[in-house]
Structure formats: C-alpha cells, structure tokens
Design a protein with these regions (language model features):
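N-terminal leader/targeting and accessory segments in enzymes
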Residues: 1-104, 273, 279-281
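Active-site beta-alpha connecting loops in nucleotide-dependent enzymes
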Residues: 12-29, 40-47, 312, 344-347, ...
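Adenine nucleotide phosphate-binding catalytic loops in nucleotide-utilizing enzymes
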Residues: 14-15, 19, 78, 197-205, ...
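Phosphate-binding loop of NTP-binding sites
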Residues: 32-35, 56, 70, 79-222, ...
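Short Gly/Ser/Thr- and charged-rich N-terminal loops/segments
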Residues: 355-377
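Anion-binding (especially nucleotide phosphate/pyrophosphate-binding) glycine-rich loop
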Residues: 500-633
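Phosphate/pyrophosphate- and phosphate-bearing ligand-binding catalytic cores of soluble enzymes
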Residues: 519, 570, 658-808
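Structural signature of FAD isoalloxazine-binding scaffolds in flavoprotein oxidoreductases
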Residues: 539-544, 571-590, 638-668, 682-689
Length: 808
C-alpha cells in the first residue's frame, strides 16, 4: 500500500490516535489505517489479548488509558467513549480534531467503490462470508470487518490499491449517513438503538436515505418487511436485487450436518449448489447474500467458495465441549436471542472441531461457523442454561418485555447487570426490569439474578450446572471475559477430576490394606461444628509408608492435600473440598510412649483429652490445660493450641514431621517459628508426633483435681452446643468476645447458626446450620463490631480449603 497517507477531512494528517481501540469497530479500522500509511496509536480501558496482538503486529502503538500522545494530529473515538474521557478532554484542550469511528471509516473509503454491508442482525457474518468468497476467488479488493475471524484465518482488515472495498457499516450512532456506497447489502432491518432512533420510522428513514445514496446495486432480504416498504416508495436509482427463499437470488437449505450445510441455489445464481461451513436458516440467508454480491461483482464463485468459511468470534463460538458444553454469542437484541435459543434447542448443542483444534459452531442467527466434523458429546435435548448480560440501558428499556419473552425459552436463566457502554442509567432500563417482566409472565421460577454481584452469580451458576447441560453466555458487552474466566475454571476442575481418576487406582495399588481411601466422604460428622460437604478423596493412612504414597501420588498429579485432625477450629464449606483430605485417625498414629529421658512421644492422631488422661495415669503433670481442647496432637501443634493460660509449644521439645515431598524430619522447638495460633513449619508439612516434656511428676489425684477445676471453668464459660471453638482472634489489647457482646450480638442468628449466649466469641450450631449460615453470621458480626467500635475482627477458625478473604 501507499507509504504516504491520503488526506482526510481536508487535512494533511499522518498521526492518528484511537480511543476505544480494543473494540470491534475501531480495532479493524486501526489496522486498515496503519496499512494506509498512517502512524496509529490506540488505547482502551479493557483490552482483549487477541486484539492487542493483532494491532501490535500491525505496528499500532498501544498506550495507557488517558495518556494521549503529544504528537497526535487526529483523534478517532468509539461512540461508547464519552466527551468526559480523559483523552478526549485533553484532545479538546489541545484543539485536536475528533471524529467518530463511522465518520473516519466513511472518509477513508470515499475514494473507493464501496460495498456496504448493513442491517440489524447478521452483517458481521455476512461481511465475513463475502470477504471469504472474494478472497478465495482472488478478487482484488480491500475490506474492514466489524469482528475477528476465528483462528485468525484472515485479517479483520486489509487495505488494497484495488477499486473495491468492503465495509461493515453500523447504523447505531447515525454515522451511516456519511456513506455513499456503490453496492449496499441490507441483511435485515429491526428496530433498535432507541437512543438514536426514538421511533421505528426514524430507522426506516435512515435506511431509505442510504439506499437512495447507493449508486450501483442494492441487495435486500426477501423476508424483510421494512426493506420492502422502502423499495415500494420508489426513488431509488440503483438496481434492486433480493435474496432468500423466494428472492431474485434464491437460496434453500438442503441439509445441515456437523460439517456444515448444503444449499440449493436458483433464480439469478449461476450455481446450482453451495457448501457452507455454517449452520441454520439464518446463516443460509447470510451465505445467499454473500454469494449473490460476489457474483454481481464479477468474482468467480464455486460450490466450495464458503466450504472452509472460518466464521467470526463471539458468534455462537463453542468455548468448551465436554460433559458440559459452553457457547458464547454476541446476540443482544430479542430477535437474535430467540433465533439463538431456537437453534441451540434444535441442534442439541452438538459441537464441531476445526483444524486448528479450537471449537466453534453456529446454529443459525448472525453467527459463527461450523467446522470440520466431530462427534456429538451430548445427549439429545440437553438442558439449556443461559447467562445474559443486557447491553445498554436504552435498549433494555426499549425491549425489556421482548427480552423476557425471548429468554423464557431457557431452562435455566442467569441474569447479569446491564453493560452500560458509557450510557447513564435510564428508567425501566435495568436488569431488574427484565426480571420484573419475567415475574409478570410467570417465567421467573427458573431465573437467578443477584443485583450488583455478577461474581456471586457465577458461583451459583457453577453449582447449578449438571452433566449434559448446554450453557451459553449471551450479550455484546464484556460478558465474553466472564465466559472465558468461567470456562478456564471449568477446564481446571475437569482436569482435576481426570487427575483424581488417575490418582485413585495408582494410590490403591501401593497402599497397605489397613489404609482407608474413600471418595466423597462426608466431613461434617468428623468436625466439632457438624457442618460441611464431602472430601473429593478421604484417606486414613495406616503407616508412614502409606502417608508417603499418598503425598507422592498427589504431588505427581498436582492435587491439593489437606490435613484433618479432630475437626475443631475449622469450617468446612457446604460444597465440600476438592482435595485429598488426610486424617491420622488410624490407631498407629495415637501413640503415647514414655521415653527413658522422662519425655513423652505423642502421636499426631492422639486426642488431647486422651493425652491428658494417659499423662494423669502416669503421674505426669503439665498437660492439664489441654484436656478441654477438642483436638488432636497434630492439630494442636499446627495451630499452637492454647487454653487456660497454656500453649501447646510450652510442653514441646521437638516435632517429627513429614514434608509434602514425603521426607521425614525431626525439628527441635528452638528451630521452629511459633507464635499465636500458628506454627510456620507445619503450614506446608504434616506433624507425625512430638516429644513432650512434663512439668513434673505428681499424684494422679492431684492432677485430676486441677483438670476438674479447668473443666468447671470451661462448662461455666463455654457453650455445650456444637461449635468450632473461638471464631475470632482477639484484637491487640482487646477481647473479641467482649466486643461482640457489647455490640449486642449474643443470640444473633443466621439460619441455625447462632452467636452463643454463653460466650460471644463462639458460633454454635443449633441443629441444622450450614457453612453458608456460619459465614453469613461471621460477616454480620464483623460488620456490626466495625460499625460500633471501629475494630475489624479477623477469623481464628480456618475456612477449610478456602481463604476467608475470598468470602468476606
């Protein structure tokens, strides 16, 4: 292409900056401008990695948001970028000309013969099909697409010295009025963009004007009523051609299989049949339009012109295919959503695999491709689960009832908050309004909406999915990022599950018969709080060698390992733990062995209560404070458990531990880092036992008397109901229990979880509490104490397998 940029807007400009450069309007235009010889830079508040890479390869400089470069001569901005944006304000202050994306596009193609692809639904796919057919025919032309081809098979824009250029023309912001095409293709027309077209007639007037400005040929869908009304007015100078089932260029869908569809062509077509790597009636219409225009331009079209059509990203792209199949689609209008759900219903979500190893499919609508044949992974008639993010408040207000009607076709619906696209909220234009419409129609029983918590919505979605489901993320906002993040987590979980299937037989073949190894063992009965779900795998090794086998196999497969003692001082999530939970519950870990030097070796699985009892019988004093702690020696070592003014490491001389690599070590107390409720060396290792030093020898009756004193104090000051022990750490210089009590929280409940009326730093299970109840009560207590005293209470109990920071 020319190394010298063309003049634009009567200006000699060489340096252009793009605002919103990551969007599908500006990114291809930026690529085209760079190919024309302009020096281009761009910024965006949220880059898509694929777009960044394409622009960077083309030499477009990517700048920080709000950092308008000093040498810029012209600013081109997306209509979604408000005048208050930092870079726009800086451009205004510097007196720089600023134009919208559509204005710039019209300016750089005005010296060419323009093929404008316009309309409401399907213009990106139709444009991509036309580009594909012309490229295959080696027809000389340039193009600017409003999207990205799947697999980067073709660039989204290509400058050319040829006379012809194809461009996807958008009507949403009124810049469509700037174009004077040689050929115009209107795929269909539907009322949208109420912020710019308050009435249906306004949209019709705009397209009538576009067709009146078209010089050579017009291609219209034979099924579009608005297009028919426009042509009936007369006054058009260009020749008018229709495409569709009964149009001048006739197109019928003969067959539709996983590898694509076969079309019967008739009327003015020179071909009798065509193969299209796409699916559904809507894409048959898109293909008919593309082939008709290609033939009109003089390109040599064949039966296979679209046989290897790559499709467009975010157009019914299959993001993941396994026991749950996940799609994403750009549909953001009720008409598009109805067609999308109908197509997914019909095809049962059967995917296909392309030669690049990525999955993509379209089943009708304005959407992406089918690809090379692959076996269906799903049962017929799967459950259809939809996640929908409305796009723009104005569109939501305009179509809230229609959205509700279209979305009612889902078996399960998850609603995200509106993607504003720079708009301010308008009355009746929120997700809550769509939800209200669904309630009004009686279709809300399968709907989940968590206002202001899209992250929480994804957690609920994950728990609701079942094997065999088809899941589709729908919308034109940033829901694509949400979809990809969700799929990444889903893939990780599926990879983890495959690892478990490898772990179990490998471990069982090497473990002793005495070792217990169970799948999905319920953990609630093994805890003092009596809440929580199952462990993915639960093990009770019988010996050191068994524990080493478990750790080696888990490390080989990168599976998480968690330790469970007596189950005190922890809360297990209701969903359970996706990890290997190891308990030293076998009798071999419960040793109490007096040593010749007066010390005791206590196994990690020995209950503290039993330790005290055995020490009392042996006449060994100094362990009495441990008697009422509902734990084991291993747990007490890891947490440096304490009570009645004593701490576990007060009586420890050395610890025997096993690293997660399976190495057995003995560490003297002096070499360990121990503080309040924490032993650093045991955070990533397993205590096997410890050598304990009694304070002195004494009569058993005297020791028993001290234990009785502690027991009486405990009974009087601590609740008897199931609990995890003290919930919060004591803040410096204060008592957590006193702060909670002074906030009036004794007896406060969430579900069956209650702040104890005996000791406010205990949360008790009144019978049927869940982990969610307890977490909810922890949040409530923290908030009330913070409001009353300005103190942030930190949990002392562990959230097993998770981090408190992720839920608080």
């Amino acid at each position: 292409m020319s190394a010298k940029p063309i003049p634009v807007f009567g200006l000699t400009v060489t340096r252009i900056h793009l605002l919103g450069a990551g969007g599908m309007g500006l990114a291809p235009l930026g690529l085209y401008l760079a190919q024309l010889g302009f020096r281009v830079s761009g910024e965006d508040d949220g880059w898509n990695p694929a777009v960044r890479e394409i622009l960077a390869r083309a030499g477009v400089a990517l700048t920080a948001a709000g950092a308008l470069p000093d040498d810029v001569q012209l600013v081109v901005y997306s209509s979604a970028v408000a005048a208050t944006h930092d870079s726009r304000r800086r451009a205004t202050a510097r007196g720089l000309p600023q134009v919208r994306r559509g204005e710039m596009l019209a300016e750089v193609v005005k010296g060419k013969k323009l093929v404008a692809i316009a309309g409401s639904h399907g213009k990106t796919t139709t444009s991509a099909m036309l580009i594909t057919a012309l490229h295959r025919a080696q027809f000389p032309c340039g193009w600017i697409l409003g999207g990205l081809f799947n697999g980067d098979t073709l660039p989204p824009a290509q400058a050319s010295d040829a006379d012809w250029v194809l461009a996807e023309v958008d009507e949403s912001d009124g810049t469509i009025d700037r174009f004077r095409p040689e050929v115009t293709v209107v795929v269909n027309l539907d009322w949208d963009h109420a912020d710019h077209y308050p009435q249906l007639a306004d949209l019709e007037t705009t397209f009538a004007a576009l067709l009146a400005r078209t010089r050579g040929a017009i291609f219209l869908s034979d099924a579009c009523q608005m297009s028919a009304r426009i042509t009936a007015r007369g006054g058009l100078t260009a020749s008018v051609h229709t495409f569709g089932r009964t149009g001048d260029f006739q197109c019928h869908l003969l067959s539709d299989i996983s590898s694509g569809q076969e079309l019967a062509l008739g009327g003015d077509f020179s071909l009798k049949q065509a193969r299209v790597r796409a699916h559904g009636e809507f894409n048959a219409s898109n293909a008919g339009a593309a082939l008709a225009v290609a033939q009109h331009l003089g390109a040599s079209i064949t039966r296979d012109s679209l046989a290897d059509f790559a499709g467009v990203r975010r157009r019914q792209t299959v993001l993941h295919a396994s026991s749950i199949q996940v799609y994403e689609d750009y549909a953001h209008h009720p008409t598009e959503i109805r067609a999308l759900l109908k197509a997914l219903r019909r095809d049962g979500g059967s995917p296909s695999l392309d030669k690049l190893g990525t999955l993509s499919q379209s089943n009708g609508l304005a959407g992406g491709p089918g690809t090379a044949q692959a076996p269906a992974l799903h049962k017929q008639n799967p459950r259809l689960v939809v996640v929908f993010q409305p796009h723009r408040y104005t569109r939501t207000a305009q179509f809230k009832a229609e959205f509700a009607a279209a979305l009612a076709g889902a078996d399960s619906l998850f609603l995200m908050d509106v993607y504003a696209a720079s708009e301010a909220p308008v009355a009746g234009g929120t997700t809550a309004d769509i939800y209200a419409e669904l309630k009004k129609s009686g279709a809300a029983d399968h709907v989940t909406y968590l206002p202001g918590s899209d992250a929480g919505l994804m957690l609920v979605l994950k728990g609701a999915l079942k094997s065999g489901d088809t899941l589709v993320f729908v919308g034109a906002g940033d829901i694509d990022r949400t979809a990809r993040e969700f799929v990444a987590r889903l893939k990780a979980e599926e990879e983890r599950e495959a690892a478990w299937h490898d772990f179990l037989p490998a471990a069982r073949s090497r473990l002793s018969p005495e070792t217990k190894l169970l799948e999905r063992e319920l953990l609630a009965p093994k805890t003092t709080m009596r809440v929580g779900g199952p462990a993915r795998v639960y093990a009770e090794p019988a010996a050191t060698a068994d524990l080493q086998v478990l750790l080696h196999e888990a490390a080989r497969l990168k599976l998480p390992v968690l330790l469970l003692g007596r189950g005190s001082n922890l809360i297990i999530p209701d969903a359970g733990v996706d990890g290997l939970v190891i308990s030293l519950g076998h009798e071999n870990w419960q040793k109490f062995e007096p040593q010749p030097d007066g010390r005791i070796f206590a196994g990690a699985g020995l209950r503290l209560k039993n330790l005290c009892g055995l020490a009392t019988k042996a006449g060994l004093k100094g362990f009495e404070f441990l008697e009422g702690i509902p734990g084991s020696v291993g747990g007490a070592l890891r947490m440096n458990a304490g009570a009645m003014g004593g701490w576990m490491f007060d009586v420890v001389e050395a610890v025997q531990l096993m690293t997660l690599a399976g190495e057995v070590r003995t560490m003297p107390k002096a070499g360990m880092h121990v503080d309040y409720r924490h032993c650093a060396e045991l955070q990533d290792a397993i205590a096997l036992g410890a050598w304990l030093r009694p304070a002195a020898s004494a009569e058993a009756t005297d020791i028993r008397r001290q234990i009785d004193v502690y027991q009486k104090k405990r009974v009087e000051s601590q609740p008897r109901e199931p609990s995890a022990g003290c919930i919060f750490k004591n803040p410096p210089g204060a008592s957590a229990g006193r702060l909670i009590d002074e906030a009036g929280l004794k007896g406060e409940r969430v579900g069956d979880a209650e702040v104890s009326t005996v000791h406010a730093n205990f949360i008790v299970n009144r019978g049927h509490a869940t982990s969610a109840d307890i977490i909810g009560l922890v949040k409530k207590v923290r908030a009330r104490v913070m409001a009353a005293r300005g103190v942030i209470l930190e949990p002392e109990v562990l959230l097993y397998g998770q981090e408190w920071r992720d839920v608080l």
